[in-house]
Amino acid sequence: MKQFGMILMFWGVIMNAQNRKTPKDSITLVDKVEVKGSKKKMETDMKMSVSVDEFLASSDKISFIKRGAYAWEPLLNNMSTERSVVTIDGMRIFGACTDKMDPVTSYLESNTLSSIDIKSGQEGSSHGATIAGSIDLKRKSTPFSLEKKWNGTYQTGFEFNNKQFFNLGNISYSGKKLVVDGSISFRKAGNYDDGNNKEVNHSQYNKFNTGIGIAYKTSPLSSVRIDAIFDMAKNVGFPALPMDLWLSRAMITSASYRQLFKESLIRSWDTKIYYNTIEHYMDDTKRPENLVHMDMPGWSTTYGLVSSVSLKKEKYTSAIELNMYNNTSIAEMRMYPQDRKNRTMFAYSWPWVTTRFAGISMNNNWEISDKSRLSFGVSLGLNYNESKYVEFNWIFHPGAPQQKTRILPGLHAGYQFTENNFSFSVGTGYGHRAPSVSEGYGYYIYNSFDRYDYIGNPDLKNEISYETNAGAGFKNGKMSIEAKVNYFYIQDYIIGKILSLGSPMNYQSVGVKAYTSLDHATLFNMALNAGYSILPELHWKGTLTYARGRDDKGKNLPFIRPLSYLTSLHFTHQNFGVQTSVNGDFIQRNYSPEYGEDQTPAYAIWNFSVNYTFNIKKLKTVFQVGAENLLNTYYSTYADWGNIPRMGRNIYTSLKFNF
């Protein structure tokens, strides 16, 4: 009944809204989640101490697999990270954990972001071959200034449920020739309690992140910039896994050159070279119940080049991008009874796999008229893999080649039309992706969700995606409503199937699965977003999403989000703000027992926060207090690994200074 009431409220506000004419707007097929310099959106729409994961979750295209309170795995269009491209300022970065406990999003903090650019399907193929799309995390970059300026923020706070203490700081200097951006952050959290006030063991984490960027103007139309990020996480627990993270370190560096042009077909040229290295050490020494201990260290090193040119001629614009990178991924398994000196087993779960990629893409926009726009693009990539220790692959795939080269094409096209306050869009796409390192070369990678060891297959075919999308919307000065749908038909869909040969290596495993290709799979996603200005100071927003995924036998795919909703009210008056929201999922009816899922019940969560803005001398100060899961509901979702319960009631406070 709670969920039914929420839907009635959702539609009731829409149906009673009054239309007022305002200048026309348009729907684009690209979602951009903006974080302005003052972060006004963050201060009013959600808690100020929001993480990158929590901020990404505000997009209707993003959901998460959660194995604990830290480093959630982002799912774009309900597809796992193998099918999407996640970058930082266009740079390719690959995690070093076979269990996906270090997604790219875990190597930044929210105080370093300026925006997050989310592109769906083949529109996201600029930075590499993809099926689901791309997520580009854009870091802050202060522009040059005619006058010397110093700006900064400092934010601190405390969350009571898991006793999390955090500090976030930013500082920037800008002048005519020189810009310097700096950031630092630290978070320390203990175990959290669920809705039954029971402690969830192994859910603690510690995270430190810092970064610097220096830009220098070499001429009125050109500049150079160097950037560096250092991220370290220690003592991170994962309650859904049989082991935890002892240490993770990442160093991400880049140097770039930007050239602008006056009154020319070429408007700008940007070139960047980059290098990043990640080390990730998992072990189970804090799990005394494990009969045999295991260390799982991993290393990932990537260097690459991104070069893009922007063109404009009257109503035509184009972006051409060259993308090249080289990655080496290594992961080990080391078993021992109690003493590391008495090692009983060693194996490479990633046997020194090198991936080299070179691709070029072209994305075009043509303003046909004031009411219509055509977008189209093409990409072509060359993907090369090599396994140094190919004998691990020969155990299950005798004679498999040590090297593999694949051609990865992509196409997309879309049309947008606006008339008065209405807007419409349609689009289509076609693209290939290569198997990931785990899918192609993984060796006995334990999946604690279905309790199988997974084996890669170097001879897997490319996944091939055929997609369609459409959207329709209405917007005036008082209300807005937008509906979006997309459909993916994925040929040679890669997934794990039970292998009759071989026995499990992990004593917790129930068997062995090998990655194989289904004939096809289908995915459908729908999102409905609406907003209504009840009063100048009072605004309502609502979102309704639905997805369905099936394999070639008509069976359900795993980790597909059930019908879900979010409804929120935001009140602001002078320096005072109040926000409240209810979000939840309906019962998960289309779950997949074959892939380890069980049915998760419906739930509804109520959140509430209050913030006040004031000045301390020349410092703009914001104080916020709020509560998540105010009713202390006990629940877990379809995407909680092993049905680990979510956090119960969490009271939080935050104080932010701007200067």
Regions found by a protein language model. Name each.
Residues 92-121:
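Short acidic/polar hinge/loop motifs at secondary-structure boundaries
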